């Protein structure tokens, strides 16, 4: 009788709780899709700090950390 109670507890309580954790991934995916809709200038402002590069004049394009922006 105790074994049946443990099995029921696992399937009726613990299993549904474990599957609810998987639903938390959806807002992150939606946020990533929204980021793709940004215009190129906004994307550049987000990506350049992430890549640890910066915008500079065309005279400084030889620097490895420089991302040359013509715009």
Curated annotation (Swiss-Prot):
UniProt entry tagged with the keyword Signal: yes
The organism's place on the tree of life at top rank: Eukaryota
A Gene Ontology molecular function term of the record: ion channel inhibitor activity
Gene Ontology cellular component annotations, sorted alphabetically: extracellular region
Disulfide bonds: 55-68, 56-66, 61-69
Tissue: Expressed by the venom duct. Is present in all duct parts with a highest content in part 2 (proximal of the venom bulb) and then decreases in concentration toward the end of the duct.
Residues carrying 6'-bromotryptophan: 60
Any single Pfam family the record assigns to this protein: Conotoxin
Propeptide feature: residues: 25-52
Secretion signal span: 1-24
Entry-annotated residues carrying Tyrosine amide: 70
Subcellular location: Secreted
The keyword Secreted appears for this protein: yes
UniProt keywords, alphabetically: Amidation, Bromination, Cleavage on pair of basic residues, Disulfide bond, Secreted, Signal, Toxin
UniProt modification remark: Contains 3 disulfide bonds.
Main location: secreted
Domain remark text: The cysteine framework is III (CC-C-C-CC). Classified in the M-1 branch, since 1 residue stands between the fourth and the fifth cysteine residues.
The family this protein is said to belong to: Belongs to the conotoxin M superfamily.
Protein name: Conotoxin tx3h
Organism from which the protein derives: Conus textile
Classification of source organism: Eukaryota, Metazoa, Spiralia, Lophotrochozoa, Mollusca
């Amino acid at each position: 009788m105790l074994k049946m109670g443990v099995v029921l507890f696992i399937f009726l309580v613990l299993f549904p709780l474990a599957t609810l954790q998987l639903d938390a991934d959806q807002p992150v995916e939606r946020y990533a899709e929204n980021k793709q809709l940004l215009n190129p200038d906004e994307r550049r402002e987000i990506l350049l700090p992430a890549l640890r590069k910066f915008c500079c004049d065309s005279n400084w394009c030889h620097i490895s950390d420089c991302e040359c922006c013509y715009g």
